């Protein structure tokens, strides 16, 4: 069952969507307690105007899920920075249609709101124990009344400022045994005992105390708490999903003016055009992992016939749009996987630039890229390849670990928004090297656009010069030359540990003994 998730600032939520949210809430939130003074046992309803009030603050955010063009779940949150402390991510409302519960819709919405590990606090007010367990799982911390009590006054002030159903007179009771707030919202608790039984185990007891009708738990976790360690199952899931996570991350790179490394398309195209045996109007070019097509478009502009391949449809769409705008009939793009695509023809020159090789932590997958590159080369044709420089990465590194023996150290790595915003993934504050495998780990935050916010663990492979030369030879390439370079200055060979030497550039020729001959 496919769901589409989106994310909007509160001020940008259209009235039509608010109407749908009101209908969903009024039909799905629950029923008033039989002891309620008004409408006992009746469905709890909420007018659009009340939802608008929750969306008024500048810090309000909406995460919602669509299925078959209908909204089936949403979460409203406040994300605001408290001076001297940091961001608080507070979910103020969560509703999921009963037909879509137990299908990870609510979990996906909540995890998106609580995903950023560098926030000061995360939480919600709720009478649902499952929501509290979701908070604990998302933030890798336990809800502990004793810890909440240390900051409950700060949280109260935050709520009075941002949450319309909390005011100066709202009663909040927090002690070592419980944390709760009287929201005077008497929803029926008939299913609460069985829910509490379901979430309580000897190893993970319920710590938040009992709950009376009209009250909700005041549930929060905090940055300075001890983290729940990575389980073997979580590590296996992380490794197995690494390729898909990386694909998501690349799709969310803004590739705008702040990505300075991507602004050298024209000068790099001139370098390519000057390579031995390469000439516009004669040389056919394949650009594997073309991204938004900056090299393909610049080469097309000076007369080359170019085909660009990338597995990200959103980047290919951007490339096609630029090519069409420039009327470049000699440039085409296709959304396909560089490891598998077979274009049914061979080229005079194949490009594979800016770390397409190295995208995968599993070296076997990178070898598939090189093998397919060779497959698409004419006999004696040439290739230009670049990968990230492991020696510079190691020289700069401040953080290292072993996933095999100390995986929890990865939890302490600081996240950054570099991949989305600048593309600078050589900042040593934000990467960690596995000493056993030399795989590089980063936590990357993505928040631009309408997709749900995400903090992803990204893995990549970087190379020493002799290693990537050896991989090229094994694939069926003769290495004509290789050098350490920086973006836009490929004609200038650098030392292996020079601060600018982030890339290794290789000019290769298809070997006569290539296995693809």
What kind of region is each of these model predictions?
Residues 342-349:
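A short acidic, Gly/Pro-enriched loop at the edge of an enzyme's catalytic core
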Residues 296-340:
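Class I SAM-dependent methyltransferase SAM/SAH-binding core
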Residues 25-92:
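A conserved beta-strand-loop-helix scaffold within acyl/acetyltransferase catalytic domains
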Residues 244, 249-281, 294:
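Conserved class I S-adenosyl-L-methionine
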Residues 367-379:
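A short glycine-rich, Lys/Arg-flanked "PGG" loop and its adjoining helix->strand segment in the class I
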Residues 1-18, 22-33, 115-249:
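Terminal substrate-recognition subdomain of acyl/acetyltransferases
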Residues 384-471:
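SAM-dependent methyltransferase
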Residues 96, 102-114:
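Conserved acetyl-CoA-binding loop-helix of GNAT-fold acetyltransferases
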